Each structure stands twice: as structure tokens, then as C-alpha cells.
Amino acid sequence: MPVKVMIPSPLRPYAGKRDSAEFNARTVGEALGRLTSEFAELRKHLYTEEGKLRSFINVYVNDEDIRYLAKENTPTKDGDTISIIPSIAGGLPSIARGGI
């Protein structure tokens, strides 16, 4: 069952500069495992040392957030798209930029 894993721009340097990869996988966890096996540098950006998906990494299957499904055990089927969306934080408060 090939599923497509979309790799976001900030993580592409750790995935051979690819924007996506396809794998045969029955679950989200299996697909992410195959992704990090192929691109070992990517693993530390997606997972903690304990092997848990990092809290700022959001994963979707066909626009459905896996946190509200079966998490990494969420089943996948042929043609599904898995999107990895890292949360972005930072910037300055408006007062620091001269605003109010």
C-alpha cells in the first residue's frame, strides 16, 4: 500500500532535499519509521530520545490530525497522504518592534 509522506521545507535538508517520499505502510507509525530509516538524520527532528513523536510535530493523514485518531497507530491505505507539519514559534512582541 503506497502512501505519500510530505516533507516540510524546514526538514528537507535532512531528507535529501526531497519534498515527499512514498512507502508501503499499514499505519502512520510504519510510514514514519520507513521515512526515518531511509533518512536517519530526520529521526532526531521528529522523535525524542525516548522514541516519542515530538510535541511540536503535527501529523495529518488526508487532513485529519492523528492526535484525534489512533495517533501513530492510525491505519493508512493506498493513496493516502501523510503531512508532517512542524509548529513554528518565535518572533518579537509588537512592543519590541516599536508597536503598542
Spans of features found by a protein language model:
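Ubiquitin-like/PB1-type beta-grasp interaction modules and other compact soluble beta-rich domains
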Residues: 1-100
